[in-house]
């Protein structure tokens, strides 16, 4: 293990490599661009890295590899998820084989975007889990957990850092080397991968049952914490707002 001083986007990239990443595809846009660039910068034997022509194409490239059992990462900014929403909605019903994490970096403010849209609404809309880190350190660990949850429940997972997480710097402890996951390859199965209405109908019930199980699983997730005790005040917060709420609570 070694220490690396990296920005949040770098922590996300290194966490994905530590998780056994096989492929990353994305489309550039602040605040997400450095994630793919960091993967390309570090030694990445067995990892395919590509800038796609748009976010929709990146989503489809990653999904195709995931069907083979590969661990895949998609990167984009929040407005890019609008472009990628068509394959995402169907993908939520088809499911995946290898872990697939979709990083959609939100930009509250906005600082460098046309909108302040909230990626978490997409997660609720298409019925998939979402991870929401509040620091680069959390992002490094959470992205690894996201791959595990994705494979466990055979679903794509959304990962939603914000600008202040993406561009903050922190010292994190990382592995000395990474090894891409070994995977089986694509197995033809028309009853699994061809999304006809009959399959969608059956999968809808499966998704609702699965999400109850995921909710129970998330209830014990180590990153969901309760700090302090007493009845003076309660702050419920996520992402970067957690840090601001924590700072405010120190003044009470």
Language-model features: locations:
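Thiamine diphosphate
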Residues: 1-136, 141, 162-165, 178, ...
């Amino acid at each position: 293990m070694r220490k690396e001083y990296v920005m949040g986007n770098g922590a996300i990239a290194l966490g994905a490599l530590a998780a056994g990443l096989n492929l990353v595809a994305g489309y550039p846009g602040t605040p997400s661009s450095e994630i793919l660039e960091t993967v390309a910068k570090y030694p990445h034997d067995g990892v395919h890295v590509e800038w796609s022509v748009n976010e929709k194409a990146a989503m489809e490239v990653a999904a195709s590899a995931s069907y083979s059992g590969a661990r895949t990462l998609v990167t984009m900014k929040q407005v890019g998820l609008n472009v990628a929403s068509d394959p995402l909605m169907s993908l939520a019903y088809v499911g995946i084989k290898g872990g697939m994490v979709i990083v959609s970096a939100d930009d509250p403010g906005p600082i460098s975007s046309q909108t302040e849209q909230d990626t978490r609404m997409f997660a609720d809309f298409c019925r998939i889990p979402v991870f929401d880190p509040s620091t680069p350190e959390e992002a490094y660990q959470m992205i690894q957990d996201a791959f595990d949850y994705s494979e466990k429940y055979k679903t794509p997972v959304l990962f939603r850092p914000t600008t202040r997480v993406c561009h903050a710097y922190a010292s994190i402890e990382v592995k000395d080397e990474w090894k891409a996951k070994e995977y089986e390859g694509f197995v033809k199965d028309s009853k699994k991968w061809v999304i006809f209405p009959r399959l969608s109908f059956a999968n809808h019930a499966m998704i609702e049952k699965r999400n109850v199980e995921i909710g129970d699983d998330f209830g014990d997730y180590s990153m969901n914490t309760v700090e302090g005790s007493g009845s003076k005040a309660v702050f419920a917060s996520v992402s970067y707002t957690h840090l601001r709420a924590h700072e405010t609570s120190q003044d009470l």
